[in-house]
Amino acid sequence: MRNNDDAWLLVIDPQVIFAAPSSDWAAPRFDEAMDVITGIAPLFGDRVIVTRWVPEPPYRGSWQAYFKRWSFANRPSDDPIFALVPAARSLSRFDPVDLPTFGKWGRRLESLLGPTPNLVLTGYATDCCVLSTALAAADSGALVRVVADGCAGSTDENHAAALHLMGLYDPQIKVVRSRQV
C-alpha cells in the first residue's frame, strides 16, 4: 500500500439531500462521517476532490423508473437540496465535480487525477455512490482505500453490507478506519 504522499481524498456527495433529516435519503450517521472527513482532509493538503450527485434530465433508460420511484429528487440541479453542506464547502480548492451518476469515477476524475491514482474514499451513501465509485475506480486500476468511519449509509445495516462487499476486492479496495489513513 502506498502512503498518503500521492493519495487523493475523494469526498463523495456531502450534500443536503443526504444530511437533512427530512430527506428520504438522509444518512443517519451523516454528521459523524462528516466529522471524520473534516478531521482527515488536512492530511491531503490540496489533494481533495468533492463530488455532487445532481440529476440531469431528460432521463433515459432505467433512470426514468428511478425518478418515478424517487420523485422527490427530480428537481433542478441548482435546488438547495443538492448544495454541499457547509462543512464540505471549503474542503477542496477545486470546484465540485458534478455528475448525474452514482459512480463518480470516470473521464472527469481521471483527467484530474490520472488513470491509476491512489484514492481515499469517504462520503455518502456507502451503499450507493461510494460503492459504485470504488468498484469503477478499482476496475480501472486505481488503488482504493474506503474510510469506513468517513462514510455513512442509508442504514447502518446497508453501510456494513457495502463495506463487506468492497472488502471482497482486496487488494484493489481496502476498507480502513480513519486512524489508518
Predicted regions and their residues:
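Active-site-adjacent betaalpha module
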Residues: 1-8, 36, 42-43, 72-181
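Short acidic, Gly/Ser-rich segments with clustered Asp/Glu that frequently serve as metal-coordination loops
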Residues: 15-21
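N-terminal nucleotide-binding beta1-loop-alpha1 segment
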Residues: 8-14
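Short, glycine/acidic-enriched loop or turn micro-motifs at the edges of active sites
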Residues: 16, 55, 152
